[in-house]
A protein has these predicted regions:
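Conserved MFS/SLC helix-loop-helix module at the cytosolic interface between two early adjacent transmembrane helices
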Residues: 61-99
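Pair of pore-lining "gating" transmembrane helices in MFS-fold secondary transporters
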Residues: 7-29
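Intracellular juxtamembrane helix-capping segments at the cytosolic ends
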Residues: 37, 115-129
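Glycine-rich segments within core transmembrane alpha-helices of 12-TM secondary carriers
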Residues: 135-153
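Extracellular/periplasmic helix-loop-helix junction of adjacent transmembrane segments
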Residues: 32-60
Length: 153
């Protein structure tokens, strides 16, 4: 959807920035829980680290899938689907009692991040921005991701 006005601050920019802040804020906090989880469950540090690496694989695998499906079904539906995967993975991970379960759920979380992360949001904001403000809008969303990581950590 193309916006015809030259306004930099648009509802799409604000919503996209908020989604990125939340997505990367939560993701940025995972490292804080490594030692408490390690101590509570007696997991090796490598098992927790592997789970986060698997999360990145889920993100990488999911990004082109969400991108392709976004073209077919629309951005809004795919962001909702991504958020659903993200939330389901987060909620179920609170019940994970083995490293393998945690790693599988981190894949689901990563897949959800693909639907709510930079690839989807930057594409949406870029399409909705005027030619005059597109680069600034994309920069604002990217900065929102960094702010989310700082807030989450």
């Amino acid at each position: 959807m193309k916006i015809n006005n030259n306004s930099l601050i648009t509802p799409v920019l604000l919503a996209g920035s908020l989604i990125i802040i939340i997505t990367f804020g939560i993701r940025g906090s995972f490292g804080i829980f490594q030692i408490p989880i390690e101590n509570e469950f007696q997991w090796l540090r490598i098992e927790f680290s592997l789970a986060l690496a698997i999360q990145n694989l889920g993100w990488g695998i999911g990004a082109p899938i969400f991108g392709a499906l976004g073209e077919k079904f629309g951005d809004r539906k795919l962001i909702i689907a991504g958020a659903f995967c993200y939330v389901i993975g987060l909620v179920l991970s609170t019940f994970a009692e083995s490293p393998l379960t945690h790693q599988i759920l981190e894949f689901i979380i990563g897949f959800g991040i693909a639907g709510t992360g930079m690839g989807m949001i930057l594409a949406i904001v870029g399409r909705a921005s005027s030619d005059k403000n597109r680069l600034m809008a994309l920069g604002i969303v990217t900065a929102a991701g960094s702010a989310g990581q700082m807030i989450g950590a």
